[in-house]
Amino acid sequence: MTPIKKVIEYGDRSLVLETGCIARQASGAVVVRYGETVVLVTVVGMKEAAEGRDFFPLTVNYQERTYAAGKIPGGFFKREGRPTEKETLTSRLIDRPLRPLFPKNFINEVQVIATVISSDSENDPDIPSLIGASAALALSGIPFTTPIAAARVGYIDGQYVLNPTLGQMEKSALDLVVAGTEKAVLMVESEAQELPEEIMLGSVMFAHQEMQVVIQAIRELAEEAGKPAWDWKPPIEEEDLKSAVQEVGEARAQEAYQIRSKQERQASLAELRNSIVESLVPEENSRWSREQVLEAIGALEKRLVREQILSGGERIDGRDATAIRPINISTGLLPRTHGSALFTRGETQSLVATTLGTERDAQVIDAIEGERRERFMLHYNFPPYCVGETGFVGSPKRREIGHGRLAKRSLNGVVPDEESFPYVIRVVSEITESNGSSSMATVCGTSLSLMDAGVPIKAPVAGIAMGLIKEKDRFAVLSDILGDEDHLGDMDFKVAGTEKGITALQMDIKIDGITEEIMRTALSQAREGRFYILQKMNEIISTPRQEMSEYAPRMIVFKINPEKIRDVIGKGGATIRALTEETGTTIDIVDDGTVKIFSADKADGQEAKRRVEEIVSDVEVGKIYEGRVSRLMDFGAFVTILPGKDGLLHISQISAERVKNVSDKLSEGDVIRVKVLEVDKQGRVRLSVKAIGNE
């Protein structure tokens, strides 16, 4: 096959899509080049579906090869290992807009693999990877509704910037990724510096408009190089089954959805489902399978709940569309942590703890674009007990990593910089109860916990999850959605921010037809909800505590002459090692002469500072020092007056009286007061006891 290439201008750079040269045994394969970043994206679909499967097994793997940046992996094995956090997050980023575009009831296994094979450290591979996944699916013949494209938007000097480089992103007040089809936005993922709703909405619309050229290029590529479409037909809907399920279960399902408690409601629904299955799926000669009946029950439940909300009725838990669940907050509840908070909203609860550490505790990220250190870490845990289940407990799953990242992005804009608060910060959110919006409960709990720890954040941050139910021209935007509303709705829309503006926005849309007006309504309603939650939070704690926990490390920061750093460190690190051991402190020195002293006790830190200042201070002529006799000689004694600085006390200067033997007056280890008489050009110090006189 002759390679086929499409080249378009996208932003201020060329985007190249090429197929037919590499990975030709895959169902679809595209090499995407943007700048000097190159990603190979492959798609493989299985023509046959496994028997008895009732879900769509789509797997997305994004992987970065270190050779892409001309590096060899660290570690003993010198090869790539388990996925990094960036790889996990990008895999989720690709998965989220693709999944809704496969046909309903399509359950064949599909795997998308995006491999970064060249990285220029300026163009993030995530956008090319998403575009490549869309193009590979369009070429593969696998049932897939329509091509999508993706764009990143920055906001620099009041202007939207399409696909900014990593260098430009350092100056941007916005990092927003949008994926969408020709007609609709499907996904938004963003972090912002407290921007207003109109700017956020404008950036989404800007991205959607700009990405149309990419969708057109993918269509042209598929027309020229696409494989024949699979001969796949959706299973015929059983109208008789729908009628039978409705007849047996509609009234009971409506009753079950009047139960306000999540666990009681789920128990009632489980009993209902089992009852319907038993009545419609006899052991012998059954017309329908168990899976078919359960699917029909799910469709019935979805229709009932959606219709009740769209007709202006109460939601599952009795609220109206804009109401927020009851909020309970407490802070400082964990006595030994540096900061803590318990945030409860309805049946969702987050226990958050903050730990302050030294620079050595920062997380080292060995990314292909270069190594960096992260001072602010946020980890989200979702144990099985929070939803009343048993399950595996171990390393974090993709969902936990993704939710933690969203919460972190929500707080990044308000966390103080290193100059104003030199501590490393780690926050852990334990989801102890969950019924929807646990990531946004984490945002609220983290803001409270940081303030409880005395971290001077710029402003409190609250988060809220919004939902949407839409049927033709009717729609309802729901505030603070439950887990069931997320499952049965058409949109999951999470917004976090301060009173000033938005700090993070995440949106996943399952249907076409979400207009700009609907998004504007959702943002406006989210703003009202956010303000209400912030008000509740401010009633408990509205500003960071002035005093940190007594168990938090104390920090002293000061500057010394950079030329004196070697004196503080000493030969082979001996001086600084002795200093830290004797004072019980941790000392970090930066090349510019900044000294950071961390200690459990304030007095220990002050003592360490005094000793560092002694080491770097210059000997002053005429000043009296308290020194220690280090060596006795026939002609006098050497006295240490500052760490690493000795002076000669001549025998004639030991006393006003005549001294015959130095040992008659002095012994090694004696502490005596001496006055500096002179420092010669060679730095030699001459001392005297006699010159002190009556001083």
From Swiss-Prot:
Domain KH: 553-612
Gene3D superfamilies: GHMP Kinase, N-terminal domain, K Homology domain, type 1, Nucleic acid-binding proteins
Keywords: Cytoplasm, Magnesium, Metal-binding, Nucleotidyltransferase, RNA-binding, Transferase
Cellular component, GO annotation: cytosol
Pfam families on file: KH_1 (PF00013), PNPase (PF03726), RNase_PH (PF01138), RNase_PH_C (PF03725), S1 (PF00575)
Entry superkingdom: Bacteria
CDD domains: KH-I_PNPase (cd02393), RNase_PH_PNPase_1 (cd11363), RNase_PH_PNPase_2 (cd11364), S1_PNPase (cd04472)
Enzyme superclass (EC): transferase
Compartments reported by the entry: Cytoplasm
Catalytic activity, reaction form: RNA(n+1) + phosphate = RNA(n) + a ribonucleoside 5'-diphosphate
Essential cofactor(s): Mg(2+)
Gene Ontology terms, MF aspect: 3'-5'-RNA exonuclease activity; magnesium ion binding; polyribonucleotide nucleotidyltransferase activity; RNA binding
EC number: 2.7.7.8
Annotated InterPro entries: ExoRNase_PH_dom1, ExoRNase_PH_dom2, ExoRNase_PH_dom2_sf, KH_dom, KH_dom_type_1, KH_dom_type_1_sf, NA-bd_OB-fold, PNPase
Residue ranges occupied by any S1 motif domain in the UniProt entry: 622-690
Residues engaged in binding Mg(2+): D486, D492
Any one biological process term the GO annotation gives: mRNA catabolic process
NCBIfam families named among the record's database cross-references: polynuc_phos (TIGR03591), PRK11824.1 (NF008805)
SUBUNIT field: Component of the RNA degradosome, which is a multiprotein complex involved in RNA processing and mRNA degradation.
Function: Involved in mRNA degradation. Catalyzes the phosphorolysis of single-stranded polyribonucleotides processively in the 3'- to 5'-direction.
Stated family: Belongs to the polyribonucleotide nucleotidyltransferase family.
Protein name in the entry: Polyribonucleotide nucleotidyltransferase
Organism: Nitrosococcus oceani (strain ATCC 19707 / BCRC 17464 / JCM 30415 / NCIMB 11848 / C-107)
Originating gene: pnp
